[in-house]
């Protein structure tokens, strides 16, 4: 799969399948009788390719769209400074997320959760005709003033859902992501790659994952199938 690699195409595709099955590098190396460094090299290449693909997606979110922030830690991402939560007193990394009710997800590491920061992402990623669901965080104040006149809020201290207004979809994604990342012991290194991988994996069948990754690899200049 790597150009000039001595690994057979069959073995390379088996590595890809193990990756899509979410089998870790150690177990994959054992199952396929390969050096773990070889498997790690492939896994890192896959994650880099996936992250690039997800970040380059330009289609705006439309319809009913949920927005929310979550915090990952305890370590901060190297090179990023500034507030780490809605309030104060934590070094956790804030991540902003957008969830379209068809299952599509977008995530972005942010410096803080201020209105300026969140609105900039919302304006770039969500169509103004969309119906935005959020909680009551003040970072979402003023969305109507910047063209999003269909903004509905849920008070989570009282209800998880009210008259169809909820952010259960994006919260389910946060749960999926944190549960999955826990097996990597927090993935302080390459956190953004793992985050984008979760974004890519969410809600897809194994067949979809394999087909999509094979397509990404086939269209890449460094990797080939």
Kindly give the residue locations of the regions a language model identified.
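Residue-level recognition of single "structural anchor" positions
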Residues: 1-225
């Amino acid at each position: 799969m790597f150009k000039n690699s001595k690994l057979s195409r069959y073995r390379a595709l088996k590595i890809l399948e193990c990756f899509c099955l979410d089998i870790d590098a150690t177990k994959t190396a054992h199952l396929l009788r390969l050096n773990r460094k070889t498997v790690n090299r492939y896994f890192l290449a896959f994650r880099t390719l996936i992250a690039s693909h997800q970040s380059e997606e330009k289609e705006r979110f439309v319809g009913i769209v949920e927005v929310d922030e979550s915090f990952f830690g305890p370590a901060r991402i190297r090179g990023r400074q500034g507030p780490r939560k809605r309030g104060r007193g934590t070094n956790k990394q804030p991540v902003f997320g957008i969830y379209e009710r068809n299952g599509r997800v977008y995530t972005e590491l942010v410096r803080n959760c201020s209105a300026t920061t969140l609105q900039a992402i919302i304006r770039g990623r969500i169509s103004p005709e969309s119906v935005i669901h959020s909680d009551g965080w003040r970072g979402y104040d003023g969305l109507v003033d910047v063209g999003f006149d269909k903004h509905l809020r849920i008070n989570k201290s009282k209800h998880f859902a009210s008259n169809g207004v909820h952010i259960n979809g994006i919260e389910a994604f946060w749960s999926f992501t944190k549960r999955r990342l826990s097996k990597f012991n927090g993935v302080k290194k390459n956190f953004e790659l793992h985050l984008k991988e979760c974004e890519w994996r969410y809600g897809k069948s194994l067949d979809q994952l394999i087909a999509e990754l094979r397509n990404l690899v086939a269209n890449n200049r460094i990797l080939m199938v």
